[in-house]
From Swiss-Prot:
The KKXX motif functions as an ER retrieval signal that rationalizes association with PVM and the host cell ER. It is a multi-pass membrane protein. It comes from Toxoplasma gondii. Keywords: Cytoplasm, Host endoplasmic reticulum, Membrane, Transmembrane, Transmembrane helix. Homodimer. Interacts (via N-terminus) with human host CAMLG (via N-terminus). This is Dense granule protein 3. Disulfide bonds: none annotated. It is found in: Cytoplasm; Host endoplasmic reticulum; Parasitophorous vacuole membrane. A motif (Prevents secretion from ER) lies at residues 219-222. Direct host-parasite interaction occurs at the cytoplasmic faces of the parasitophorous vacuole membrane (PVM) and the host endoplasmic reticulum (ER) membrane via GRA3 and host CAMLG association. Direct insertion of GRA3 ER retrieval motif into the host ER membrane contributes to the host ER recruitment to the PVM. The chain crosses the membrane at residues 22-42, 162-182. One of its GO terms (cellular component) is host cell endoplasmic reticulum.
Length: 222
């Protein structure tokens, strides 16, 4: 007897390498079959079945209430009195919120207009009380440029001693300050905007009218 069993175990432990590689794949498959069989047996027990006449637990409890075809929710005995909510109420709330937003924007626009008016008054007062900046520099540079040009035209010595770039630089600076003096009123009385901000505003898209959505929603409601 022992001589027959021992060679069997020895032969089973010395099986081929290919069969040993199949064992890790066969074991999970066998476990799955056993678990499925046990689950089927447990489901066939009569204790797990529920009569059709009995109400299903959970319905009407914990604030769960049935809903009719119109979308209104009825109050249940356990959840207390509940208000019926119609789908149109949600749309009306959205329209009211949008109208409030438009009103707030209109109030903000009126405030901005008042602020701009106050700033314009301050600019006018600044223009009346202050002298034009750069006026003295414009006069001095203009006189220096005119004297250098006249001296180079009259005297050969001044032509050799005064370089041409000196006259050009003085002429450019004089023109800059003359322009600054002449445009002082416009720069003070109007709102100034930085160069980069003006470039960004030029390429920026204009926002759409937010009130158009409210008008469309009101038309649909009517």
């Amino acid at each position: 007897m022992d001589r027959t069993i021992c060679p069997f175990f020895i032969q089973s432990f010395t099986m081929s390498t290919a069969l040993k590689r199949l064992i890790p794949f066969l074991v999970p498959f066998v476990v799955f079959l056993v678990a499925a069989a046990l689950g089927g047996l447990a489901a066939d027990q009569p204790e797990n079945h529920q009569a059709l006449a009995e109400p299903v637990t959970g319905v009407g409890e914990a604030g769960v209430s049935p809903v009719n075809e119109a979308g209104e929710s009825y109050s249940s005995a356990t959840s207390g009195v509940q208000e019926a909510t119609a789908p149109g109420a949600v749309l009306l709330d959205a329209i009211d919120a949008e109208s409030d937003k438009v009103d707030n924007q209109a109030e903000g626009g009126e405030r901005m207009k008042k602020v701009e008016e106050e700033l314009s008054l301050l600019r006018r007062e600044l223009y009346d009380r202050t002298d034009r900046p750069g006026l003295k520099r414009a006069v001095i540079l203009s006189l220096a440029t005119s004297a250098a040009i006249g001296g180079r035209m009259v005297s050969r010595t001044l032509r050799d001693n005064i370089p041409g770039y000196f006259v050009v630089i003085n002429a450019i600076l004089a023109a800059y300050y003359i322009r600054k003096v002449l445009t002082y009123r416009r720069r003070v009385m109007t709102k100034r905007q930085p160069f980069m901000s003006s470039v960004k505003n030029f390429f920026r898209r204009k926002p759409k009218d937010e009130g158009a959505g409210v008008d469309k929603a009101s038309k649909k409601q009517t």
